[in-house]
């Protein structure tokens, strides 16, 4: 399986930063970092949609539970800092590309962040950006997707050895869906080793069949009327199950958190809304109402079995 290293891009970034010893790079950082709103957002709201970044996860049951708010893990402070670092690193990636002479877009003409969605937004995500000027493309003027990721040392070394598709299949699924929905033929995947700041650049071509497979998977998970079969068939001792946020729900009959999404009366609607079919309510329910639930809550009968 070919790996299309974007060596010209990597070398150009290093060359341009070195030319003035990082002056222009730091200037861009000062402009870009304040725009990375996710890094400074104080809210801890629940994600109302199934994110594209998770669609390559091997366990469809886990995806169903995420979308249905079955559990809400409380992360250790170190993990929260790790998540935030990923957001902050996005600003550094963008500053690198701008320093190297790339054109970078993250918003449309109305100032809205580029997003892709299916089923009225039930399945979707914002993309990292679109770039023009990649010297590794046959036509550098062609607009392509860019996806930016941070890696620990072990993960980064595997990436160097095997390429993104093999070493990070969830990243591969994510960018395939993005490219397909955005009508882009390639993705510039940029990664950084958090240990020593080494960067890795690879071009990922669109595989429409793979993209369609994962889009279909996302839609099926969203519209599923009960939890799909997942890795839980392997048993509680399976390593991915032991680390899963929903292990207690799968193996130890832990009831789900109370919300409309775990209620027997709730229904997903293809237009991006949720509906309560309880005869007393019988209407569309807002996200705030879903979080709060109501006095008619009745746990869906597929939990605990």
PLM ranges: what are they?
Residues 158, 165-172, 177, 181-280, ...:
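Metal-dependent nuclease catalytic regions and adjoining charged, substrate-binding loops involved
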Residues 154-160:
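Active-site-adjacent loop/helix micro-motif of nuclease/hydrolase catalytic cores
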Residues 1-145, 152-154, 165, 295:
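Metal-dependent nuclease catalytic cores that hydrolyze phosphodiester bonds in DNA/RNA
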Residues 7, 18-19, 27, 89-90, ...:
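Glutamate identity and glutamate-enriched acidic tracts
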Residues 142-148, 185-189:
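Conserved active-site beta-strand-loop modules that form the wall/rim of enzyme catalytic pockets
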Residues 148-152, 193-194:
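A short mid-domain helix/strand-loop element embedded in enzyme catalytic domains
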């Amino acid at each position: 399986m070919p790996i299309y290293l974007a060596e010209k891009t990597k070398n150009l970034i290093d060359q341009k930063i070195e030319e003035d010893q990082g002056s222009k790079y730091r200037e861009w950082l000062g402009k870009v970092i304040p725009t990375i709103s996710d890094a400074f957002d104080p809210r801890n709201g629940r994600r109302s949609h199934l994110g594209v970044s998770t669609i390559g996860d091997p366990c469809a049951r886990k995806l169903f539970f995420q979308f249905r708010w079955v559990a809400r893990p409380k992360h250790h402070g170190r993990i929260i800092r790790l998540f935030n670092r990923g957001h902050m690193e996005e600003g550094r990636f963008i500053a690198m590309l701008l320093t190297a002479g790339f054109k970078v877009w993250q918003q449309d003409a109305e100032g809205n962040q580029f997003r892709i969605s299916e089923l009225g937004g039930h399945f979707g995500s914002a993309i990292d950006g679109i770039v023009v000027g990649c010297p590794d493309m046959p036509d550098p003027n062609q607009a392509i997707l860019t996806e930016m990721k941070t890696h620990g040392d072990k993960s980064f070394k595997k990436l160097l050895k095997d390429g993104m598709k093999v070493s990070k299949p969830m990243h591969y699924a994510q960018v395939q869906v993005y490219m397909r929905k955005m009508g882009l033929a390639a993705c510039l995947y940029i990664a950084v080793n958090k240990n020593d700041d080494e960067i890795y650049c690879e071009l990922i071509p669109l595989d429409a069949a793979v993209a369609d497979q994962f889009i279909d998977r996302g839609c099926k998970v969203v519209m599923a009327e009960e939890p799909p079969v997942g890795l839980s068939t392997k048993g509680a001792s399976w390593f991915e199950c032991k680390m899963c946020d929903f292990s207690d729900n799968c193996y130890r009959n832990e009831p789900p958190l109370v919300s409309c999404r775990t209620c027997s009366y709730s229904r997903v609607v293809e237009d991006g809304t949720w509906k309560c079919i309880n005869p007393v309510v019988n209407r569309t329910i807002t996200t705030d109402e879903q979080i709060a639930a109501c006095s008619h809550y009745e746990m869906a009968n597929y939990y605990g079995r």
